[in-house]
Amino acid sequence: MAKKAPDVGDYKYGFHDDDVSIFRSERGLTENIVREISNMKNEPEWMLDFRLKSLKLFYKMPMPQWGGDLSELNFDDITYYVKPSEQAERSWDEVPEEIKRTFDKLGIPEAEQKYLAGVSAQYESEVVYHNMEKELEEKGIIFKDTDSALQENEELFKKYFASVVPAADNKFAALNSAVWSGGSFIYVPKNIKLDTPLQAYFRINSENMGQFERTLIIADEGASVHYVEGCTAPVYTTSSLHSAVVEIIVHKDAHVRYTTIQNWANNVYNLVTKRTFVYENGNMEWVDGNLGSKLTMKYPNCVLLGEGAKGSTLSIAFAGKGQVQDAGAKMIHKAPNTSSTIVSKSISKNGGKVIYRGIVHFGRKAKGARSNIECDTLILDNESTSDTIPYNEVFNDQISLEHEAKVSKVSEEQLFYLMSRGISEEEATEMIVMGFIEPFTKELPMEYAVEMNRLIKFEMEGSIG
């Protein structure tokens, strides 16, 4: 007998805790709210000016007319800033008890003890816990919450902040620029290579909450770093908004891998701008796992500015009932002999919709550049849908571009073969899906791969019958 499809209340991360915040802004977006955020953070005047200019841009810019339906997103019904505690603690014992219980349930302290070089935990609008191995500090590595970096490393911060994603980039980048709070700031000095990942974990707890972290990563010449972020939120009947901005600078011969495993509840709008500048022989890797949310619109972007620069995006998107995953990648070739790879894996079930939306651009100076794109979609029933929307711009005739797209269903032959060996239809379907996503999970650190497989199995419950 087939299992009953899980109710939203079965969502593992769907619990929410009592409100323990020490400050909560009024709902709605106004100039006073923006000034209040900046004042509470004791920011320099230039940052307040940046926020106010961004707010004006947000008001002027139109909503996206493509992608998913944003008509129910009410900016006046969102709380833009919630301060959960007085400061980010470096000792787990000093984190407020209610917040600590939340992260204990999510396994954050255990994960840190096992295999992380540093960890940051953000709850609502602020980082509540941050720690990094002392030996990394001694090497000159900076890993701190973005607000602290503004106060303590202002010159370095100001040099790179909003240089990759300006406020005018799009409406949601403007919104983030006006009300940003929290996020991670990482600087890795020349020729320093980190062998273990740095991690940040983002948790929305309140109803009608907006989370607007700002992450900035700088890998100096010859440096290497792997950053992992995880995201969850409780299940509510009303919507929350997650609108982050990620800026990464990969200098000459440097390497950055940015891994995301998001598992938002299905009442969250996830509208994120991620972009990196990659210089000579630098290498940027986006590894992007998208589960949950009401609507995700996210297209990690590599701007390849130096000769020999490389960019890649490996992504998985899973859309279930009432969910739209509008995701993809952008590769902008601006220099000779640059290369990019996009591998997109999408799964839809129970009427979910997955969309691959990608742009590959070859500029006039991109002689010898090449790009390879693979889009594979697995549809698990007749109610679910998939679209592939590639857009290629070519301004140099000495480039190479390959694009392969495939949409398939679980085949009767595969099911028959597995079921003839005593495996149930549900287990057989699950095995086929696991094989489909294996190119993604094999790129994750072992602990994350185990968690991703477990999340997919949870999403698969009730797919048969």
From Swiss-Prot:
It holds the Pfam family SUFBD_core. It comes from the Bacteria. GO terms for biological process: iron-sulfur cluster assembly. Transmembrane segments: none annotated. NCBIfam families: sufB. Belongs to the iron-sulfur cluster assembly SufBD family. This is Iron-sulfur cluster assembly SufBD family protein SAOUHSC_00851. It comes from Staphylococcus aureus (strain NCTC 8325 / PS 47). The lineage of its organism: Bacteria, Bacillati, Bacillota, Bacilli, Bacillales.
